[in-house]
Amino acid sequence: MKYYLSLFIQEFEKACKIAIRYKFDTIFNICFWAVLIVIVSHVLSTKHPGNIPIFVNSFMIWLITNNSFIAIVESIMKENTQGTLEQLYLNARSFYSLLTIKGVTASILSIIESMFTLSLCVLFEANVKLSMILQWIYILPLLFIAIFSLIGIGIACASFALRYKNISTFYSMVSAILFGILTYGAILLNKKPILMMLFPFAKANATIQLFFKGKNLINIDTYFIIIINDLIMMILGYVILKYYLKESKKTGSLSKF
């Protein structure tokens, strides 16, 4: 356990240093989404000002899930393209655990960047209140538990790179469309627990949306469904990764990047 905690700290420090080193890209990413939210909010304010908080919170959910998923996939693909994935695989520790830690690190950094985006919106959009940031801080524990479903599906998606090498267009489209649809339809699915367990981040998505509408459904049942969803997605990621690792070993392509 001490080993994994130390590894997580090292990975997080590494991710932060990379974000600072390439600060232009990091700042541009934060500001771009903030500007987009502010522009759409100003358009909405002319006819439906009351819908702005709903829009901002829904967009934040999509932004966190989309960016976290992409960050997870890209962190694994980077090991792939740099030729270091084989070294991780040969590590005496659990290969899947190492990838999971990378996924957790990428997700946390994406959540932090998204919170900076929301903070900028507070400065430039009157209908986005400081209390909204406090509400997001309140639901952070739920977010941190639910991100494991994103990590699982992210590892599953990144596994395709072992076979097809370049999948950037594929995972970008899957991410934008999948999490866009889930954010739009999460509340409709909320009454169907089985479906909530089968779609990544679906229960957390619906719970967060309802929370911002004044319906606090964060309880033991909610956490139970989220944890089951996490386990299903993590197992799915493990199975797909295992399959493509075997295929790569057969063809000898694991070290050929």
Regions found by a protein language model. Give the residues of each.
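Short amphipathic alpha-helical coupling elements at transmembrane boundaries
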Residues: Q10, K14-I18, K78, Q82, ...
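Hydrophobic alpha-helical transmembrane segments of multi-pass membrane transport proteins
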Residues: P53-L123
